[in-house]
Amino acid sequence: MRRRLHKTTLLFFISIGLITLDACRKKYYATAEDMAEYGWVMYETQDYLTSNTWFNSAVSEDVNWMDGYNGLGWSYAKLMVLDSSIDNFITGLGKPQDKWNPTDIHSEILAGLTFAYHAKGIDKKTIEYGRAFLDSTVRPLKAGWVFAHDSLLNYLDVRITLAASYFSVGKFDSASLNVQIVLDSLNSSVIAVSDTSLEGRKKMAEQISALQTSLLKQ
């Protein structure tokens, strides 16, 4: 009979390469969930190549494991293999989320797609997935989204990325609106630049860039 180990114990065995054990004639095995969880352990230590390997193992074990594709998307993005990142995120969107997983994986994938498309300079797709992310996460009296595997990354990073892409496609009013939301969320007294003259656009671009840099440190 096959049984699962306690999560902490199993992750330890995975870490030293013992995926299947035979003790007292009981088979203990690592599931796709376990492999994905260990992939996130590696991701959080910034070992993105190893984490990517474990996420690949997770989706090989269970082709419907949504969080495995989520992890592949994020780890490929960190490795700057952006096409593979996007492909896995999109595949993950079509998979069912495990009802016992408290993490909103769907929103993590939408955020990941926003960042990945922005890194590729595809602003229309950045806006498409950024707006889908906001539709998925913005609720009255609900705390803003924070990435479960990097607390420095949150909904404000998505907002400012969205603002940058709006600016790039010439939708300056939308860019300014998102900048103001970020500033208000930071309790800043600064007003978003709304002047769309040539000089105003230059200042708007500088404001967006400064906020992107500042948010990376918070």
Task: Locate the predicted segments by residue.
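Alpha-helical segment of the N-proximal tetratricopeptide repeat
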Residues: A30-S57, E61
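Terminal, low-structured helical/coil segments at or just beyond the last alpha-helical repeat
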Residues: A164, S168-Q218
